[in-house]
Amino acid sequence: MKRLLLLTLMIIYVVPFAGAQSTPAVVNPAIDMQGYLRISAEAAKYRESRRLTEAEFIQMSREDGTVILDARSQEKYNELHIKDAINLSFPDITVESLKSTFPDKNARILIYCNNNFVGAEKPFPTKAPTASLNLSTYIALYSYGYRDVYELGPLLSINTTKLELISTPQSVK
């Protein structure tokens, strides 16, 4: 009787774990979490010296060969964006779209995101700090080989910023 009870308990506790160990990992060669974590750590170190004050951002934006990238959705970009910024929505960042938009990987690119502005929640909805679009955009550009990337650092009020913010007129349908 004791043996039967012991055997039953072993089956109850051991069998579920045995099955879990034999389940094969789901592999997708187009998704590389370990590579992403590695490149993110590398980009994070590189990024620290490339965060700009508002004045530095304005000064750099006026220099020849510098472009401003707005990676928010086209809708949010149209509502309000930094004057002269180019819109390339984050989900649309690919090898092809980057080649088309920034053919020179050595071009200086300035980035900003929702979490750089307060006072206009509709065009600049706040994201969780760890989900800031600046972080994703910086890592993506770094992953594709763009190294001359700078990020607007501070949180600015749209009412007091020295950056010129404009709307894109919508075409009439």
Describe each PLM feature range.
Residues 7-16:
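Bacterial N-terminal signal peptides
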Residues 56, 72, 136:
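Short Gly/charged-rich anion-binding patches and loops
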Residues 67-72, 85-88:
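Short hydrophobic beta-strand that contains or immediately precedes a catalytic carboxylate
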